Amino acid sequence: MCRPTWTRLRGGKRSVQGDSGPLIIIGGAEDKQGECKILREFLRLGGGREARVLVMTVATELPIEVGMDYVEIFKHLGAKDVRTFDVSSRDAANRDSAVEFVRDATCIFFTGGDQLRITKLLGGTRIDAAIHDALRVGKPLGGTSAGASMMSSTMIVDGESETNPRIGVVNMAPGMEFLEGAVIDQHFAQRGRLGRLVSAVAQYPHHLGLGIDEDTAVIVEGRHFRVLGKGAVSVVDAGALTHSNLDSVGTNESLALCGIKLHILPDGYGFDLRARMAITDWNEWKGNHNKELTK
């Protein structure tokens, strides 16, 4: 199984060095009726009109209804083939037929629902390995809402909204490890989740916190990501934290965090995951980056 690996930098920071396929991480409630900007980009990355999309409905309790919605959307956008696949047991996730579904797809998409269902049913199975292998050979992996949260190595399971950073306001669990070194939260601005994301990053200061608004996506390619959609992405960086009272306060007591960084990045901006720096014009940066690669 191919897993992303850590690269240690000067100053003790750690960066992401992931598999080669792009990750399309959506904050939920993506546009499905209008321009469908995010889903259209996912499909483009997955092969456009030659795309064979596998929609994973494992997170939802309504796999037929949710799955058919995405089948209709991706077919409307021009996909060559769209299949849904629901996993109801770990035994099913280890079958040869399940692995073949993954191998045959040119791109894989996880719907929303409950992120714990994804890790409980897929973590450590042959499907888990097959999806990581698909990423390694460059196939895109997308996920929305719960399908976004599960992508990190440490994921937010649930927690309080509209709260200041405190001990006990967020519950964490191991994720699927498609993106190391990050903690992801979704429906971010709409549900007032800054407090719980900061609380999570305070407990894991070596991780970046990525808070993704609705109808907004982070598209990770290598060590960089770009932002696409109507909202913004909030990046919480505790790497330069100078003081925390985490070890001296109890449950529900307020956290003191000094030196923490917050970046707010709308459509057209990006982020360097290695340097932990914002990219203020993605298209300009990408053009210059490509020129450097061809020298």
Question: What is each model feature region?
Answer:
Residues Q115-T125:
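Glycine/threonine-rich flexible loop motifs
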